[in-house]
Every structure is written in C-alpha cells, then in structure tokens.
C-alpha cells in the first residue's frame, strides 16, 4: 500500500497477494515491486551471460531471467547461477526436462509456458524438481502461444482464453500441493494484457509478474510498457515486472524503475525533473540533463533533482526537490538545497557543482536513515 497523507490523490492500494520467494527475493504481499530483465546472450556462453547478468544487477535488477533452450544451456546454468549476484529464473519452453535440469543447476525459479510445457504428468515432474531444489515457479501465459484447445474454443487469443489457461495451470500446481508460484498474462496488445490481469485478479491471490510482451524497440516499447504497466500498477495490480524491449537489458531495468518512480511505488537513484527547454532557457538544459544522467548513475540513494531553464517554473519546482538549479541571466543561475534558495553558480561550473551537491545530499540522507534505524533499535 502506497499512502501519502499529505497528497491523498497519490495513494495506491495494492492488490492483496500472497508472498513467495524467488531465491532470497520476496515477491508479492507487502514486498516492494521488483524489477526484472532477461539476458539476450547465448546461454551456452556462460561468461558473456554472467557479464550481462552482473550489468543488469548493477543497474538495479532484482531478478534476471535466462533462456534454457537445450541441454548445453542447462549445463551452463550451473556456472551462471553460481556466479550471479541476483536470483536466476530459468525460461523453459517445450522441453520439460530442461526445467528439471535448471532446478538441479541452481535456478531460483522456473518459468513454464502452459501452451507448450506438456501434459499434467510432465508438469508434475517439473513441480517435483522445483520442490526438491527450493525453486518457485512462474506460470507464464502468453497470447502468442496459447493451448490449441483454447484457440479452438475462443477463435483467437483473448483475455478469457489467457485467464482460463492460467487458472487451469494454477489448479495443476495446487493439485500437486505446490503454492510457491506467481503468474503472468502477457500479450503485445496492451488492452488484452490489462483485461487479462484485471480478470485474473478476481480469481487468485497468486502474485503477478507483469509485462507487455514483444513491446518493440526502445522508444515504442517504452511507451507501450509505460501505458500498459503504468495503468495496471496505478490500479494496484502487480508484484514484479519486466519491461520487454528490443534493446540492452540494462535499459529495460532503467525504464522499469522509472515507471515505478513515476507512481511513487519504488525509489532508486536520482529522479531528475527537467523542463523541455525553450527560448527562455538560461543554459543548455537538454545537454546538461544528458550529462547529469550519466554522471549521477552511481547514486543509488532515492532523491530528487530539478534542472529548469528559467524562472517561470524553476523556483517552484526547486522548492520540492533535494537539489535544484534554475537558469537566470548573465551566465549564471540559482542553486537550491533541500527546497531552499542557497547560492548562485555560473553555468560553466554548474554541472560539476550539482554533482557535488547531489553526492553530499545523498550522504546526508543515508546518514539520517542510519541514525533513525539506530534510534529505533
């Protein structure tokens, strides 16, 4: 539940779901909404895959999924799971034995696709492997790979077919007394995706893995995911998420956090508030923001920074941020600290100075949080 007593219009009541564990990461219940991505290297190239997993983890990924299409990939999972700093989800399609092998290799979770994993007997074997090796399971329903009998029944992929597929497989797992599972309802169509999740929310308390599948390239996929996932999250639906892009997995993680930050559901790093710039700007806003985004990537402390080109909105925005800079005249602007006007700074020195002030503010916030924790003990 995200409640703001001062600004109640920002409150989000999260759907009540049960909590499971993906490795050491809680998903569902009152746990933070986690951000995932998926590697796009050859899994058999363990070193390249591990390198990509580490890069994603450094960007903030809580969980990383790795495809296991064949026996050689399953063997590589031993090293990948051992070296990964975050829990690994094994992505399983068609070959149920790959799921068993991935569990044995150390995967924290097995993603199975109801449309191609096979019959109940095969699912039972996967469930046994998951239980034996302390794995959770994701039931990953996808509009593009629904079961044949559901396509015949409904005529085409649709929310009803997706929900029926998911509920059938929930029953399969529960019949095997297995409850450490989450479920996803993914389609490339945001309307279908949203409708499926909304219908499913009334039928199960399983945690939801969220995503708009095959969303597209960086720009189009970001917009699609922000609209589709943003609306569901705003409605309180969702426990873990992946932004699917035809792009670097690190970019998926960044966009995922930006969506959560925009809704006040999770905070990580510097939230930069900047204007689009116009003829009134007292400095090059666009270039400045580009540089600051790169130079402040190392800051993990949740905080806000306003970079506004002129005095129309600059002072007002700065009052609501930890650090702010508002363009003025004569090659300088005003620096704001903790919502208060502080001092002038030249445009030439502004970037270095802002980085320094953000770092100082981050240290102060961390120190305050540590002191509060110690006082509470």
UniProtKB/Swiss-Prot annotation:
> What's an example Gene Ontology biological process for this entry?
isopentenyl diphosphate biosynthetic process, methylerythritol 4-phosphate pathway
What the entry lists under Gene3D superfamilies is as follows: Dihydropteroate synthase-like, Sulfite Reductase Hemoprotein, domain 1
Cite the annotated pathway. Answer: Isoprenoid biosynthesis; isopentenyl diphosphate biosynthesis via DXP pathway; isopentenyl diphosphate from 1-deoxy-D-xylulose 5-phosphate: step 5/6
Q: What EC number(s) is this enzyme filed under?
A: 1.17.7.3
**Cofactor binding notes:** Binds 1 [4Fe-4S] cluster.
Which Pfam families does the UniProt record give? GcpE
Q: Which cofactor does it need?
A: [4Fe-4S] cluster
- Tell me the residue numbers annotated for binding [4Fe-4S] cluster: 275, 278, 310, 317
Instruction: List, in alphabetical order, the Gene Ontology terms for molecular function in this entry.
Output: 4 iron, 4 sulfur cluster binding; 4-hydroxy-3-methylbut-2-en-1-yl diphosphate synthase activity (ferredoxin); 4-hydroxy-3-methylbut-2-enyl-diphosphate synthase activity (flavodoxin); iron ion binding
Q: Which reaction does it catalyse?
A: (2E)-4-hydroxy-3-methylbut-2-enyl diphosphate + oxidized [flavodoxin] + H2O + 2 H(+) = 2-C-methyl-D-erythritol 2,4-cyclic diphosphate + reduced [flavodoxin]
Q: Which cysteines are joined by disulfide bonds?
A: none
Query: What range does the record give for the signal peptide?
Result: none
Q: Which UniProt keywords apply?
A: 4Fe-4S, Iron, Iron-sulfur, Isoprene biosynthesis, Metal-binding, Oxidoreductase
Q: Which InterPro entries match?
A: Dihydropteroate_synth-like_sf (IPR011005), IspG_bac (IPR016425), IspG_bac-typ (IPR004588), NO2/SO3_Rdtase_4Fe4S_sf (IPR045854)
Q: What does this protein do?
A: Converts 2C-methyl-D-erythritol 2,4-cyclodiphosphate (ME-2,4cPP) into 1-hydroxy-2-methyl-2-(E)-butenyl 4-diphosphate.
Matches recorded under HAMAP family? IspG (MF_00159)
Write out the similarity annotation: Belongs to the IspG family.
Q: What is this protein called?
A: 4-hydroxy-3-methylbut-2-en-1-yl diphosphate synthase (flavodoxin)
